[in-house]
Amino acid sequence: MIYAIVALIGFSAKMGCFEVAGERYTERLRAMVFRAFLKQEIGYYDEDDHSVGALTTRLALDSKNVNELVTKVAGDVVEIIATAITGLVIAFVYDWRITLITLAFSPFIMGASFYESKIQRGFEDETAKAHEYSGEVAGEAIKEIRTVAALGKQGYFEAKYRRATNRPHRLAKRKAYLSSIGYALNQGVILYVGAAAFYAGMKFIEQRVIDFDDLFVSLLSVMITVHGIGRASVFASTYGKAKNSAIATFEILERQSKIDPDLEGIETDTSKIAGDLSFENITFRYPARPDIPIFDGDFNLEGKAGQTIALVGPSGCGKSTAIGMLQRWYDPVDGVVRLDEHNTKNFSLHNLRSHMSLVGQEPVLFDMTIGENIRFGVDEGKQVTQQEVEDAARAANIHKFIIDLPDGYDTRVGDKGSQLSGGQKQRIAIARALIRKPKVLLLDEATSALDSESEKLVQQAIDNIISEGGRTTLTIAHRLSTIQTADLICVVKNGRIVEKGTHWELLKLDAEYAALVRQQSLNADH
């Protein structure tokens, strides 16, 4: 009775304490891993092993597996140790002979448990990688569901996902077959030990060495101990998964970002930034494609404060890469990128990017209201008035559309801005960029994905912004009609600038730029 009461209290305390501790640890661990993901440089996400699906799967599963290590494995270890010590003490007190006979078989019990646990752990690495890949496939399909639906490729992704999940299924079956043998061996040894101890006990009773009561208590205590030790193999699989997850988790926690956002550097107020830009003898290769040079030491560009600088050229020549290096998504292998004569590496990362705003080809809006999306462009801690939001929207040529909506600026845009057209999303993205009051505005083919009517509205907004002055604009343009008024047009080819000048100066050269103009059937006399 006393043993039962103590066990009741002990098991309850164990379950409660370890579950609470595990949940608290998991919450902190997930937050730490997510923070570590956000600190990594952009090149980290270019690697195949670091796709959205793989990372989100790891974020969900690794923390869960480590949680099981804390709640189940650690709790079971404490329980087994406590049970073993208590059981052996009781068994020795009531009859040391039965206890010693049972302990003589302990190497066989431990061997069977080790065999089963080895089988359990042996599949964990392969299974974890297989689950990551299946998560990657699912993430890709769901993320691009509109494209998948438009192309009618649901069947393709269903088959691909089925193949991806088939591997962990096959591994699970192999594991089940082998584990069944290990489990049977483990339990068989335990039962054999119990039978041997009981047989010896009956012989001792016949010889009047012990009485039945002492045999019963001693045998029961030692068998509880043996069963507890035998259970060690049960959580071997949990331990294996948790170990692999812990290794992966601490790899990301301990990984030092190549472009660390927490490093200190120049902290300059935006009002003191002029907006001069320069790229000097840049050499660059993407970390995920080190064998393919983008810039080979010959990329040089200088832009003065207040200028509009346009980069044109064929796809893959490095135009967007230049913008990425200016924002320090990537650092050059060699050469220097400067903002106002300062190497961009000398700025703190947050301060550097606070002087810039980027509007990309595919505008990204978050699942919040229009007003919140625009305010999202301002650094945390800075107060933004509704008037400032509306002024930014007017400058982006989107204010009238917003106030005509039933909920106005409180209208939710949906996931990825799904409730809005491409042109509307782009103009809201421009408003978000403008509310930052940047000294450098970066436009990466901001109109190339729009229809003619939306392009006209967006381009009108961009022209108005440029005409205001007060900032340097670096724009990448596929449609040359949008950059004819730029102060400096640079033609990028094979990783270097082969021509630069105004629209008319480059037309007179009758070389690369003029060929691009003719290719787009642009009226050179316009």
Enumerate the predicted regions with their spans.
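Conserved catalytic Walker-motif region of ABC-type ATPase nucleotide-binding domains
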Residues: 161, 249, 279-281
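Cytosolic ends of transmembrane helices, especially the final helix of ABC transmembrane type-1 domains
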Residues: 23, 150-153, 177, 218, ...
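Hydrophobic alpha-helical membrane-associated segments
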Residues: 6-22, 105-119, 145-146, 197, ...
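Short intracellular "coupling" helices and adjacent cytoplasmic loop segments at the cytosolic face
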Residues: 23, 31-57, 63, 137-160, ...
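Transmembrane-helix motif of ABC transporter permease domains
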Residues: 1-27, 47, 111-112, 173, ...
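An intracellular "coupling" helix at the cytosolic face of ABC transporter transmembrane type-1 domains
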Residues: 61-70, 74, 119-140, 149-197, ...
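Transmembrane helices of ABC transporter permease
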Residues: 76-125, 199, 203-210
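ABC-type nucleotide-binding domain
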Residues: 270-526
